[in-house]
Design a protein with these regions (language model features):
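Class I SAM-dependent methyltransferase Rossmann-like catalytic core
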Residues: 15-62
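Conserved class I S-adenosyl-L-methionine
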Residues: 65-74
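Conserved beta-strand signature within the Rossmann-like core of class I S-adenosyl-L-methionine
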Residues: 165-180
């Protein structure tokens, strides 16, 4: 579905919800990069430190000269660590935000002149065929940031299976998965003191105004982050601070004070839940690295034979 279709459908249902992938226009991508630098947002710095520490072991496991395929590349900061470790022949970053993707890819190409960089603008949340330029290469998927946690369990399994199909037989996947931890730590990471995450969430409404001829009053909404214990996830919502009516894509909507639009989930995993999810998605975990606090996992998995994948 298009941005327009998802917005109209999401605002019409109860409870209201808009898929998180629409956060990432240029402004949203830049705001998310700012989030990754916040002191409260532990996943980025923790995962980067794990990768630095695991570098030699990772290179021994996967070898060199392969094609690194990164799903949702963003600014490719952690990719630089990975490229230094495994020295790939090709780097294929995939991202939905085209301008942001091309700028980030150009920076990587400038820094690593011996690596062929092929930016690929696509929504990796859907099945896709990789460019022919990497058809004959050994493929190493990279899916950092615990982005897998943004999906419902069934959707996460579908995505992992799609990745396995895209990467092919003999592929490896390096995936970051955030662990269950203290609720206060989790809530601070998704509701920072500076309000950057709030701006990121509210940018979704600003995007509706920019792209769908909307007139959503941004000051009528506030960012809300909650921990859903039963579902083991952080939820982000846009909550109406007062009764409000607005237009989006030619349709009129009204929301009562306290009503929310659910914009994102971020599931957190126990070690066993992470392994079960990967296996259900057609991947067999072969190695795991964690930080000293046990907050975050980086897992190396290999494609399971088709008969072994559920």
């Amino acid at each position: 579905m298009s941005f327009r279709d998802d917005v109209l459908a999401g605002l019409a249902v109860r409870p209201r919800a808009i898929p998180a992938r629409w956060f990432y226009d240029r402004q949203g991508s830049e705001l998310f990069e700012a989030i990754t630098r916040l002191p409260e947002y532990y996943p980025t710095c923790t995962e980067a430190a794990i990768l630095e520490k695991a570098c030699a072991e990772l290179a021994d496991e996967v070898g060199r000269g392969l094609a690194v395929v990164e799903f949702g590349s963003g600014s490719s900061t952690k990719t630089r660590v990975l490229i230094r470790c495994v020295e790939p022949a090709t780097y294929l970053p995939i991202d939905i935000s085209g301008d942001f993707l091309r700028e980030a890819a150009a920076e990587v190409a400038s820094e690593f002149s011996g690596v062929q960089v092929i930016p690929f603008e696509a929504d990796f949340m859907r099945p896709l065929a990789l460019p022919k330029a990497v058809a004959g290469s050994r493929k190493f998927g990279f899916f950092p940031g615990s982005t897998i946690g943004n999906l419902e369990p069934a959707g996460a399994v579908d995505l992992l299976r799609a990745m396995r199909g895209s990467l092919g037989e003999g592929a490896r996947l390096l995936i970051g998965m955030d662990r269950v931890k203290d609720q206060d730590v989790l809530l601070a990471a998704y509701d920072d003191a500076e309000g950057v995450t709030a701006a990121f969430n509210l940018n979704l409404l600003a995007r509706i105004n920019r792209e769908l001829e909307g007139d959503v009053p941004l000051d009528a909404f506030r960012h809300r982050a909650v921990w859903n214990e039963g579902a083991s996830r952080i939820e982000m919502h846009l909550e109406a601070a007062r009764d409000v009516a607005f237009t989006a894509a030619g349709e009129r909507f009204a929301m009562a004070a306290g009503e929310t639009v659910h914009t994102e989930n971020s599931h957190k995993y126990t070690p066993e839940a992470a392994r079960l999810l990967l296996r259900a998605g057609g991947w067999e975990p072969v190695r795991e690295w964690i930080d000293e606090r046990g907050w975050f996992s980086v897992i190396l998995a290999e494609a399971r034979p088709p008969a072994a994948a559920p």
